[in-house]
C-alpha cells in the first residue's frame, strides 16, 4: 500500500452520518485505509474505503456484504474485528478495529530476518486466527505480511478476510485475472483460481520462509512470472540461505508448500499443532513481537494530532473543508423528475447539522471545560476538608 503525502479529499467527511474520516493511513489498488472515529460510540476505528468503481457493481456489493457479515461473526483475538459495512455515495466501506501499531511488512523492512523464536511468536496468532476461520468454512486467500498487523501492545492480528473473494465477484474484474499477491499464491490459485484451507497453508509456508530469510522464495521480472514459477518448482530450504535455521523449520515449510494440496497440512489447525511441537522440541523462548517504529499508522496518528493541536492553538473554530467542488453551473442541470432519487447519496461533512470539524472542536472544548470545573471542585473540597480538620483539632485541644 502507498502512504498518503497530501490531504485526501475524503478527510473530514462523515460516512453514513456516523464515521468521521480523520486521516489517511495508506492506499492500494482497490482501496484506501483511514483512521476514523465512530461519532455515535466515540470509538476509534479503521475505515477501509473501496475504490468508487465498485459502487455500482451489484455483484461486488452483494459479496462484500456477505463476506463482511461472515467475518464479523468470528470471535478471535487474532483477527481484526469487523464492526460494520456500508456505502456512502460512491464509496463502499468497511469499518474495522483500529490497530495502533503497524504491519509485519514494515517490521521486516526495519529489522530484517527473524530468529526461530520470533517466527513462532508471529505464526502462533496467525495460525490461530486462520484456524478459527477454517473451522467456520472461511478461506483468507491473501495471507501476506501487509495483512498481518502488530499492535503497540505486541498483539499480532490477521486482517482483510474475504476482500479477494469480493473483488473476484465484481463484474468489472476481468476473467482469467490472477487475484491475490503473486509471491504468496498457492499453485492451485495460479492455475485455476480455486482456494481452500490448504491454499492458506501454502501462503503461510511462504511467509515462514520469508520471515527466516528476509525474502520470498521466487523472484521474477513480473508478478505473472513469479506466480507461475511455483507450478514447477518447490520452495527451497531456508537453511540453504541462512545458516543456523533448524531443520524442523525446513520440514515445516516443505510440508506447508507442497505443490500437491493433498501433501500439505489439511488446514491451519494441523499446521499450528506441528508448530507447537517444534517450539517445544527446540525449547524456544517466549517472545513479544515489537510493532514497527516508523509505520504508516503511527505517522497518520501523529499527523492528525498535529492538525488538532494547530487548530487549538489558533483559538478559533476550524474552517470546514468541503469534500466536493462545484464543477458546473446550477443551470447546467435539469431538475430531477418528481419522486426520483439521486444515483448516489452524497457524503455529508456534517453531524446533526453542524460542520464536522466544528463538532470536533466543540467536543474537545467541552472536555477541557469539564476538566477545569473538576479541578476547581476538587480544590474547594480540599480547602473545606483542611479547614474542618484544623477546627476539629483546635476543639479537641480546648476540651
Swiss-Prot record:
Keywords, ordered alphabetically: ATP-binding, Cell membrane, Kinase, Membrane, Nucleotide-binding, Phosphoprotein, Serine/threonine-protein kinase, Transferase, Transmembrane, Transmembrane helix
Record's comment on post-translational modification: Autophosphorylated. Thr-173 is required for autophosphorylation and transphosphorylation activities. Thr-175 is not necessary for autophosphorylation activity, but is required for full kinase activity.
Record CDD domains: STKc_PknB_like (cd14014)
Gene name of this polypeptide: pknL
Tagged with keyword Nucleotide-binding: yes
Consequence of changing residue 171 to A: Does not affect autophosphorylation and transphosphorylation activities
Protein's name in the database: Serine/threonine-protein kinase PknL
Sites where the protein binds ATP: 25-33, 48
Modified residues (Phosphothreonine): 32, 62, 173, 175, 323
Any one GO molecular function term: protein serine kinase activity
Catalytic activity: L-seryl-[protein] + ATP = O-phospho-L-seryl-[protein] + ADP + H(+); L-threonyl-[protein] + ATP = O-phospho-L-threonyl-[protein] + ADP + H(+)
Highest rank taxon of the organism: Bacteria
